[in-house]
A protein has these predicted regions:
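Acidic catalytic/metal-coordinating carboxylates
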Residues: 35-38, 61-64
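Two-component/phosphorelay signaling modules centered on CheY-like receiver
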Residues: 13-31
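Conserved sequence signature across two-component system core domains
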Residues: 9-10, 33, 51
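Receiver (REC) domain active-site loop signature in two-component systems and cognate sites
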Residues: 57
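Active-site residues of response regulator receiver
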Residues: 10, 54, 82
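Active-site beta3 strand of CheY-like receiver
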Residues: 46-52
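C-terminal output helix
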Residues: 88, 106-119, 123, 127-133
Length: 135
């Protein structure tokens, strides 16, 4: 089976490097970009199976990118990678077509799972570390 093609968008180079390392064993990373406009253009041009989007990026937010992809009928699955532990933002991401919502501090354990779930058409949401109960 062919490896799934993934585009990654985040404005922080260290995050792009980490994501690339996490995905290199299982996915074909077709491009890594650092702003929302580049993410939109690259997704429309390269037609990846899945797009990993940071929410807070220059030029266009990840949410705006996802909304535009949805408007244009693009079939790429969307997973958001974010620092935001916020249920309202999560709802906005879902409305924009996002199937995955991964908190950056959990990307080592959650990102690949979220991507696989999204590719299968299922939703995945990281637990919010700030809501964890302490004994």
């Amino acid at each position: 089976m062919a490896r799934k093609r993934v585009l990654v968008a985040d404005d922080l180079a260290p995050v792009l490097d980490t994501v690339s390392s996490l995905l290199s064993q299982s996915f074909d990373v077709v491009d890594m970009v650092s702003d929302g406009r580049a993410a939109l253009e690259a997704t429309l041009k390269l037609e990846p199976d899945l797009v990993v989007l940071d929410i807070s990026m220059p030029l266009m937010s990840g949410i705006e990118v996802a909304e535009e992809l949805q408007r244009q009928g693009n079939k790429a699955k969307v997973v958001f990678l974010t620092v935001h532990e916020d249920h309202d933002i999560l709802k906005t991401c879902r409305a924009a077509g996002g199937l995955g919502y991964v908190i950056k501090v959990l990307m080592d354990t959650d990102l690949v799972s979220a991507m696989n779930e999204a590719l299968a058409g299922h939703m995945f949401t990281s637990r919010f570390p700030s809501e964890e109960q302490t004994p």
